[in-house]
């Protein structure tokens, strides 16, 4: 059981959040009247009161100074899994992300060399609306057993990211995942850039904690095909059987299947799989591996405990 010590809002971006006695939460926006609301996964930001109190040993800060909407006592929020669900009165929040990078002009970091929001702040979307008040209790709800597996899709394409070519593979993956029951949290289109890809893989696996990341493109022999190397650089455990199975299946269709350098790995509880770049090859490979992925993903997440066939 936790307690709301402060509710903070700001009417415009770039201005400090200040405490208010109450607020209205809506699924469409987040906190009514707060500039950082919208139709996205970071409608409401939360920070543990205990973390603010510890930071005050270095520098006194008011509630809202870190850009947080809700100051919550009684929970170490950043240690909870994504998604976690909270009830505040009639309102229900779904925690969707842990941490985010400070903006480039973070005054607190300039003063102290540190800011706790990137590692201690969490973000949520409003599942059910309601009015909340300072002093309200916040309850951690049981995670629903029927939640869909959560996925993200990344297309790697220099031409696609510059608007010179339509991305057909990414939307196809989203369509196939959705049809299979996955919830696709994000679909990104990036250039073949190692730094950008690594940043997004780390964010999706560590902060958003999606169950599955599928990349498309950048798995061949061209000089800018860097997807497998970046994928392996973020891996904590190898899962080579998936990439090997795709190569085996591709070889039954074309001898060029041997030219794929695709990797498949695990980072914490997130499975990352590299798919080819062409829509035809994406469809062929994903149709082949998709029926078996869910069991492996659930094992990695600790949701299934039995792997042997009966």
Question: Model-derived features: where do they sit?
Answer:
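N-terminal small/polar loop signature for handling phosphorylated ligands or for N-terminal nucleophile
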Residues: 178, 184-215, 220-234
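Electropositive, beta-rich accessory/interaction domains or terminal extensions
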Residues: 1-92, 97-100, 131
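Well-ordered alpha/beta subsegment
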Residues: 121-144
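Proline/glycine-rich low-complexity loops and linkers
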Residues: 227-310
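Mid-chain, well-packed structural core segment of small domains
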Residues: 73-108, 237-263
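Solvent-exposed alpha-helices and their adjacent loops that cap or buttress functional pockets
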Residues: 15-18, 36-39, 115-118, 144-147, ...
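Glycine-rich phosphate/diphosphate-binding loop of Rossmann-like nucleotide-binding domains
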Residues: 146-192
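Short, structured beta-strand/loop micro-motifs enriched in basic residues and often containing a Trp
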Residues: 65-75, 114-127
């Amino acid at each position: 059981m936790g307690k709301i010590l402060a509710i903070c809002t700001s009417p415009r971006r770039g201005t400090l959040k200040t405490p208010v006695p109450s607020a209205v939460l809506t699924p469409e926006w987040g906190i009514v009247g707060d500039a950082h609301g919208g139709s996205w996964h970071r409608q409401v930001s939360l920070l543990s009161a205990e973390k603010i109190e510890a930071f005050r040993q270095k520098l006194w800060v008011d509630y809202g100074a870190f850009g947080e909407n809700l100051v919550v006592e009684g929970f170490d929020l950043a240690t909870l899994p994504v998604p976690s669900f909270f009830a505040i009165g009639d309102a229900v929040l779904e925690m969707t992300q842990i941490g985010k990078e400070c903006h480039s002009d973070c005054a607190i970091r300039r003063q102290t060399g540190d800011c706790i929001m990137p590692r201690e702040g969490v973000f949520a979307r409003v599942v059910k609306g309601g009015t909340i008040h300072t002093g309200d209790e916040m309850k951690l709800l049981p995670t629903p057993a029927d939640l869909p597996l959560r996925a993200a899709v990344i297309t790697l394409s220099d031409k696609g990211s510059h608007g010179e070519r339509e991305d057909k593979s990414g939307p196809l993956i989203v369509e196939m995942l959705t049809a299979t029951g996955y919830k696709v949290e994000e679909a990104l289109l990036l250039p073949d850039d190692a730094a950008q890809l690594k940043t997004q893989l780390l964010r999706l696996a560590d902060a958003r904690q999606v169950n599955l990341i599928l990349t498309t493109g950048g798995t061949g022999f061209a000089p800018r095909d860097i997807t497998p190397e970046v994928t392996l650089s973020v891996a904590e455990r190898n899962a080579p059987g998936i990439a090997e199975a795709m190569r085996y299946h591709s070889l039954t269709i074309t001898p060029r299947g041997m030219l794929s350098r695709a990797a498949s790995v695990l980072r914490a509880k997130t499975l990352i799989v590299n798919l080819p770049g062409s829509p035809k090859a994406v469809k062929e490979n994903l149709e082949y591996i998709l029926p078996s992925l869910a069991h492996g993903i659930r094992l990695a997440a600790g949701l299934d405990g039995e792997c042997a066939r009966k």
